[in-house]
């Protein structure tokens, strides 16, 4: 599996014949240093953790571009976000699911799990877009990935690890809207047994967020987990033991 981070909480997973975008916030993302065309080339699915504009991002335009090319680009999201996207012109691209549920996407499975945050559209708080979530992505022969979404620490992260056995975790560290570096590091140490790789995210993109991952990485220097900080636009291969 090849993993690319585009800054903020936007990731791309490439494996087998799939190219999966998670929270594709490109336009307006100060950390984004590529082009939308390049970042989305060959994309087969979009997954959304919640409805804030810095996570829904370019979803509608990407779905419209796919439709113009006579193909459907599935968007996995909660029912409220799917209804919102349909109203914005995304048609029937939405693939509805909700917390605790799993969805077979044909070649991989997505499970929605808890995140402690909020969720609303660009007009929020007037637009309620369901509960925020994290996403567990499983594919045959690949390490299980957990994108935590935007969240604070919670003790049942340990239960999520017991149930889903993720090997790679994307964890927010930016503070103010999510947990900060110290709390995120504590979450890794206390509640993420068996995780082999953690990738910090949701930082450095806006001035009000923590600007770098150095404290987070230093706090985990003596912990048996690999901290990968790819930098915006950077990629790495997750060649680790599949779950």
Swiss-Prot record:
The keyword Hydrolase applies. Keywords: Hydrolase. GO terms for molecular function: hydrolase activity. The keyword Hydrolase applies. InterPro entries: Metallo-B-lactamas, RibonucZ/Hydroxyglut_hydro, UPF0173, UPF0173_UPF0282_UlaG_hydrolase. SMART domains: Lactamase_B. Transmembrane segments: none annotated. NCBIfam families: PRK00685.1. HAMAP family: UPF0173. Belongs to the UPF0173 family. This is UPF0173 metal-dependent hydrolase Xaut_3786. It comes from Xanthobacter autotrophicus (strain ATCC BAA-1158 / Py2).
């Amino acid at each position: 599996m090849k993993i690319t981070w585009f800054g903020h909480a936007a990731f791309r997973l490439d494996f087998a014949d799939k190219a999966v975008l998670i929270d594709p916030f490109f336009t307006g993302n100060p950390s984004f240093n590529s082009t939308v065309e390049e970042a989305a080339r060959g994309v087969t699915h979009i997954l959304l953790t919640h409805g804030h504009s810095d996570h829904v991002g370019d979803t509608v335009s990407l779905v419209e571009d796919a439709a113009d090319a006579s193909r459907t680009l599935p968007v996995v999201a909660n029912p409220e976000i799917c209804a919102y996207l349909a109203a914005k012109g995304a048609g029937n691209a939405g693939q509805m699911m909700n917390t605790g549920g799993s969805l077979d996407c044909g070649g991989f499975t997505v499970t929605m799990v808890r995140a402690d945050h909020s969720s609303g559209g660009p007009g929020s708080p007037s637009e309620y877009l369901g509960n925020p979530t994290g996403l567990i992505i499983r594919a045959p022969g690949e390490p299980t990935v957990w994108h935590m979404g935007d969240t604070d620490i919670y003790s049942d992260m340990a239960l999520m690890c017991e149930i889903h056995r993720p090997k790679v975790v994307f964890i927010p560290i930016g503070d103010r809207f999510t947990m900060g570096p110290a709390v995120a590091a504590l979450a890794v140490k206390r509640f993420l047994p068996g995780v082999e790789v953690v990738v910090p995210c949701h930082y450095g993109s806006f001035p009000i967020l923590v600007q770098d991952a150095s404290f987070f990485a230093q706090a985990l220097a003596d912990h048996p987990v690999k901290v990968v900080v790819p930098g915006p636009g950077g990629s790495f291969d997750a060649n680790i033991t599949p779950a």
